[in-house]
Amino acid sequence: MTRVCRALLFVLCGIFVHAQENELHFFGPRTDVLVVFTASREAQERETRAVQQLRLLVQDFEHQTPDVSVLVAITAHDHPPVPDFVPVDRLTGTKKLISLISSYKAPIVLILDETTGPPRLHTGAHRTVCPPWLLQAVYQHLTSHHVPIRYRDFDAILHRLGWLHEDPRHALYIKEHIPAVRMENSLYPPGALHTLPALLTQVYSEEWDTHYVSVSYGGTLYLIREQFFVILILGAVITLLLSLAIFSFLSDSRKRHYWNTILAMWWLPAILGVLSVCSVFVATQLTALFFLIRFGTHTSTGALPLLALIVKHSIAIALSCVCMANSKTIRDSMLHNGFIGGYLASTLCLLYAVLFSVIDFSLSAVFALEYALSLVFFSAQRKTTRRIMLAMMFLLFAPFLYAYLKNSAVTAPLSFHQSNVFFALGCVPFMLFMLTLFFEREKSHPRIPFIRRRNLLLSGALLTVLVINGVLWSVSLSSTRIPQEITACYRISERGLTLSLHSPLPIPRHIRARTHARLSTAEIQKAQDHLQISMDSRSYFGGRINVLEVRSQLRAQAIELRITSPHGTAAYEADRPFTRLEQGSVVRFISQARPPLPFTVTFSGDQNSTMQVQATVWTYDNPLQDAPPVMQDTTVRFIPMFELTRDVLFPSPSSQGVHATPEKNACIRDETVPNLQE
């Protein structure tokens, strides 16, 4: 049986036709550029202010038809109201919309969201930002219509670093290489959105520069393009070569002195780099250990991300200071050749302008500015000037530090798994600057013993660790005032009843326990009577078309089907997306959230094959008379949920006379479709 025949059969029989759940409104003639306004209903399918704004926009377009292609789409089932552990098809409406607009040559998407704060423009997701022409056009158009849109110029860099929360719908458009921006506002003035499609059609370009930086001033948005950063990196390389060649213009004695000092101190940045990386790695493991001891789970750092970052980096700084203070080699080298520390640090800044451009081109500009400040630091003779330059370098990275801590829910997973090396290497120039100032002070104040300053430093590091651990042990994840929500999932199958607890926060030790309760066969059968499975089988072209239907007396939140064919392929094609497992002998279907009942799946399979069907339904309705008790606690609020699983065996059509009916409430009907003449 060929795939063409199966597809033809599906079309002829009309077995599956799913209702379009997205609300679509097309306006204007069909052109290459399609401007899409879209918003999503909430989890309870309630219309948000953004959806209401789109309905007003539809009325405007009906009154005055645009001259370009415009689509107003209200998507459904993007925010399923089920816990994360329930396997449902998420972002269903957005996926359908993407498959629809992909037929156009140049779709442009504007996502509308409501907000309680000031209007804001979001340009990035999936570590990518929208094209610069789209950002500039939308920003200046809204400001010209007196919409006080808020856009932080620094957000473009943070989006590329992955340090900001991203909307999953926006990420889907970016992954499909569809230009998209997300606008948060409660209400737009009349005409602000109506005239936007014509402007976007005029400024559309296939160019997609992802490494730009924006500067907004006076209602105008200025863009620094990618070419600037390429030239900046080339300039950094040329400057580095010139800084090495400048030694040839020095006198022989000074040249020899500088080269001897550099050759004697070349190892210092390498040692500090290794020390910084090791300190951050050890601090990461110690922080995870402290949180494990305190909360009892390895994932507890995600529950308190800001505290986890503060603990980790405080320990890393303390370890680095302790190691540097106790290193006699570093002390002797800096006392005799301390002047070269600033030069080595400035050279590192120049190298980092090239190295960190691998992460993001715009970071090369930041390190180029740090290099300029480090040159002043190195050449300055007054200590006050050096301290001012060091403070300015700290201020240069202050926005990164603020965003790093503010968005700790996003940056903490990166910090604990991916970004340790780059973060540690980025601290090396500051370590060199601090060492230079520290040992210059020792030279100017020889009466203060070094051992006293070292002990003071060690005492400060130890006190920092003790204070942090005291704060850690005083923090609680839940309280009687704000109880922790835990989903208690009762799993009912032929094996009996099990209870599992799920929560985005770590579950306390005295509550985190799995209960294995026993149910009698009669109780299991009574619970499974709420779930009926039937299959209609049709023979066609040497194969079979199967229509599997799941009915439930319970209000289903999600449904999962696993179809197993032990001696063949479970499914070749189907009317729903599915996943093949175990080389095709098992297929898996998952529904959207709150699927309409009965849940029907149509698929093609082998002519004579035995099928094992496992249906799982998640519901908040109780199929049992009495649910097993859960431990009561004033700091926890339990949400009961039930996972009902039923297995049904459908024998092959050739053996139906031998086998009995599969099960109660499970039936199979066999019909033969006459062969169609070609």
From Swiss-Prot:
Residues 653-678 are annotated as: Disordered. GO terms for cellular component: plasma membrane. It is a multi-pass membrane protein. It comes from the Bacteria. It is found in: Cell membrane. Coiled coil: none annotated. Its main location: membrane. The chain crosses the membrane at residues 228-250, 263-285, 300-322, 334-356, 361-380, 387-405, 420-439, 455-477. Keywords: Cell membrane, Membrane, Transmembrane, Transmembrane helix. This is Uncharacterized protein TP_0564. It comes from Treponema pallidum (strain Nichols).
